[in-house]
Curated annotation (Swiss-Prot):
Cofactor(s) of this protein: pyridoxal 5'-phosphate
Protein family (similarity comment): Belongs to the group II decarboxylase family.
Catalytic activity field: L-tyrosine + H(+) = tyramine + CO2; L-dopa + H(+) = dopamine + CO2; 5-hydroxy-L-tryptophan + H(+) = serotonin + CO2
Subunit structure: Homodimer.
Record's GO cellular component terms: cytoplasm
Gene it is expressed from: TYDC1
Listed name of the protein: Tyrosine/DOPA decarboxylase 1
Enzyme Commission number(s): 4.1.1.28, 4.1.1.25
PROSITE patterns xref list: DDC_GAD_HDC_YDC (PS00392)
This protein's record includes keyword Lyase: yes
GO biological process annotation, one example: amino acid metabolic process
An example molecular function term from Gene Ontology annotations: tyrosine decarboxylase activity
Length: 518
C-alpha cells in the first residue's frame, strides 16, 4: 500500500474547515448581503461607465492563485478596491444604455436560493420541483401576456405547447430554428439543407445570424430585408412576400421568419399579424422575438403589439431585461413542443428512468442545447409572488412615464429632435443639423455625415463624464442617441438630471464649434 505525499497532509491542515460549513456560510453570507446592500445604497455615487483602461486588472492582481486560504474580509476589500472600479454599473439609476438589466430584491434572493440549492435539473427525476415549478411559472407568465392556450401546458394534454426557460434570446432562437430546420428537412430530405432560407428585417437582433450559421444555413440564404422610416423601421409584409416569391422562383425553400417586437436599435415593432399571414402561405416557422418589449405586454395598453401571436410558432422575451429578474432568464414558448424535442433530445442509458419512460413528465434537457440546466424558475417565481401582477405593471408604467418625461424635455429644446417615435421606455434623439451648422452653407452630402460625427462626439463627452451612460444606434444612415429608461432605482429626478447633463455638454460642444463648422 502506498502513502499520501506529505504535501497533501499540509494542504489539508491549511484549510480544515468544510467548504460548506453551515455556520461559516451564515457568517460570510451575512457579510455579502451587507456588502451588496451598501453597494446599492451608494451606487449612484460611482461613475456609471467604468473609467479604467484595458488591462487594468492584470496590473493589480497577483500572477497566480494563492497557496494559502484568504479571508472573506480580505477578498471583499479587493472587490471594493479592484473590481468595483472596473464595473459599468448597470443597476445605477443613471444607467440609460443598451437595454435595462433590471434587478430586484426578489430576483437577487431567488438567484440565491437557486444557487444555494445548486441542483442540476436536466430531467424531471434529477429535481422534480425544478421542472414542475418551471412549467407552472411559464404558464403564469403566459397567462399574464394572454398568450393563446396553444402556447401553454394543458392539464389534459390537449395542447402540444408549453414554455421553457433558456439562458438568452440567442439560445431561444437557435433552439426554434433547429426545430424548424429538422421539421422541414424531414419533408424535403437532409440533402437540401443548402436550399433553406431564413428571413428577418435589417433591424433584427444579430443573434439570429449567428444561430443560422450554427444551424448550418447557407450564409447566402440568411436574408435581412431592408426597412425604412416610412414603416418606422418595421418589416413590411409586402417586402417579405416579394422576397419569398423570388426565392421560391430560384428553387429555394423558405424556412424561418424572426419578427421583432421592440428592436434593439429603435424599439421598432414588426406587424405580427400581417407577417404571419404571409409566412403561413409558404409554411414558414414564425418566431416572435420580444426580448425587451415583451415584458410591457402584461399591461393591457401594450398588449396589442403582439396581436397576431396566435399565428406564430414560438415567442420569447427576456425576463432579465425589463422584468426585474436577474440574468439569465429568457422565457420561450412554443406551440409544437414535439418538434423541439425531436430536434434536441438525447437518450443516453445513464439518464433513462421510469418517470421519463412513462411520458408523463417533462425532461427540459430536450428543450434546450445543453444537458445541464440551472434552476432559473426559482427567481422568476419569487419575482411574480413578491410583487404581483399589479405592482409589476406599475413598475413598467413608471418607466414609460419617465421616458415620456424625457421626450417632453427634448421637445422644449429646439436644438434636438426625436429620430423615431417612442413606443415603450426608450427615446432616440439627436442634435439637429440646423443646430450644428446654423447659417453656414454646407454641401448636402456632407450634412448627415458631419451631423452624425457631432452627435457621436456629444455622446462620448456625456459618457466620459461618468454622470450618466447612454449608447447609440444608426438607422437609415442617421446616428442617434438611445436613452433607455429601465433601471429599477431610476426616478424622475434622475431623468431630469440626465437631460441637464446632455444640455451642458451640448453647450460646450456647440460653443467649441463656433464659426468653424463647415
Amino acid at each position: 500500500m502506498g502513502s499520501l505525499p506529505a504535501n497533501n497532509f499540509e494542504s489539508m491542515s491549511l484549510c480544515s474547515q468544510n467548504p460548506l460549513d453551515p455556520d461559516e456560510f451564515r457568517r460570510q453570507g451575512h457579510m455579502i448581503i451587507d456588502f451588496l446592500a451598501d453597494y446599492y445604497k451608494n451606487v449612484e455615487k460611482y461613475p456609471v461607465r467604468t473609467q479604467v483602461d484595458p488591462g487594468y486588472l492584470k496590473k493589480r492582481l497577483p500572477e497566480s492563485a494563492p497557496y494559502n486560504p484568504e479571508s472573506i474580509e480580505t477578498i471583499l476589500e479587493d472587490v471594493t478596491n479592484d473590481i468595483i472600479p472596473g464595473l459599468t454599473h448597470w443597476q445605477s439609476p443613471n444607467y440609460f444604455a443598451y437595454f435595462p438589466s433590471s434587478g430586484s430584491i426578489a430576483g437577487f434572493l431567488g438567484e440565491m436560493l437557486s444557487t444555494g440549492f445548486n441542483v442540476v435539473g436536466f430531467n424531471w427525476m434529477s429535481s422534480p420541483a425544478a421542472t414542475e415549478l418551471e412549467s407552472i411559472v411559464m404558464n403564469w407568465l403566459g397567462q399574464m401576456l394572454t398568450l393563446p392556450k396553444s402556447f401553454l401546458f394543458s392539464s389534459d394534454g390537449s395542447s402540444g405547447g408549453g414554455g421553457v426557460l433558456q439562458g438568452t434570446t440567442c439560445e431561444a432562437i437557435l433552439c426554434t430554428l433547429t426545430a424548424a430546420r429538422d421539421k422541414m428537412l424531414n419533408k424535403i430530405g437532409r440533402e437540401n439543407i443548402n436550399k433553406l432560407v431564413v428571413y428577418a428585417s435589417d433591424q433584427t437582433l444579430s443573434a439570429l445570424q449567428k444561430a443560422a450559421q450554427i444551424a448550418g444555413i447557407n450564409p447566402k440564404n440568411f436574408l435581412a430585408i431592408a426597412t425604412s422610416k416610412a414603416t418606422n423601421f418595421g418589416l413590411s409584409p409586402n417586402s417579405l412576400q416579394s422576397t419569398i416569391l423570388a426565392d421560391i422562383e430560384s428553387g429555394l425553400v423558405p424556412l424561418f421568419l424572426c419578427a421583432t417586437v421592440g428592436t434593439t436599435s429603435s424599439t421598432a415593432v414588426d406587424p405580427i399579424g400581417p407577417l404571419c399571414a404571409v409566412a403561413k402561405l409558404h409554411g414558414i416557422w414564425v418566431h416572435i422575438d420580444a426580448a425587451y418589449a415583451g415584458s410591457a405586454c402584461i399591461c393591457p395598453e401594450f398588449r396589442h403589439f403582439i396581436d397576431g401571436v396566435e399565428d406564430a410558432d414560438s415567442f420569447s422575451l427576456n425576463a432579465h431585461k425589463w422584468f426585474f429578474t436577474t440574468l439569465d432568464c429568457c422565457c420561450l414558448w412554443v406551440k409544437d413542443s414535439d418538434s423541439l424535442v425531436k430536434a434536441l433530445s438525447t437518450s443516453p442509458e445513464y439518464l433513462k428512468n421510469k418517470a421519463t419512460d412513462s411520458k408523463q413528465v417533462i425532461d427540459y434537457k430536450d428543450w434546450q442545447i445543453a444537458l445541464s440546466r440551472r434552476f432559473r424558475s426559482m427567481k422568476l417565481w419569487l419575482v411574480l409572488r413578491s410583487y404581483g401582477i399589479a405592482n409589476l405593471r406599475t413598475f413598467l408604467r413608471s418607466h414609460v412615464k419617465m421616458a415620456k418625461h424625457f421626450q417632453g424635455l427634448i421637445g422644449m429644446d429646439n436644438r434636438f429632435e426625436i429620430v423615431v417615435p417612442r413606443t415603450f421606455a426608450m427615446v432616440c434623439f439627436r442634435l439637429k443639423p440646423a443646430a450644428i451648422f446654423r447659417k453656414k452653407i454646407v454641401e448636402d452630402d456632407h450634412i448627415e455625415a458631419q451631423t452624425n460625427e457631432v452627435n457621436a462626439k456629444l455622446l462620448e463627452s456625456v459618457n466620459a463624464s461618468g454622470k450618466i451612460y447612454m449608447t447609440h444606434a444608426v438607422v437609415g444612415g442617421v446616428y442617434m442617441i438611445r436613452f433607455a429608461v429601465g433601471a429599477t432605482l431610476t426616478e424622475e429626478r434622475h431623468v431630469t438630471g440626465a437631460w441637464k447633463v446632455v444640455q451642458e455638454h451640448t453647450d460646450a460642444i456647440l460653443g467649441a464649434l463656433g464659426e468653424d463648422v463647415c
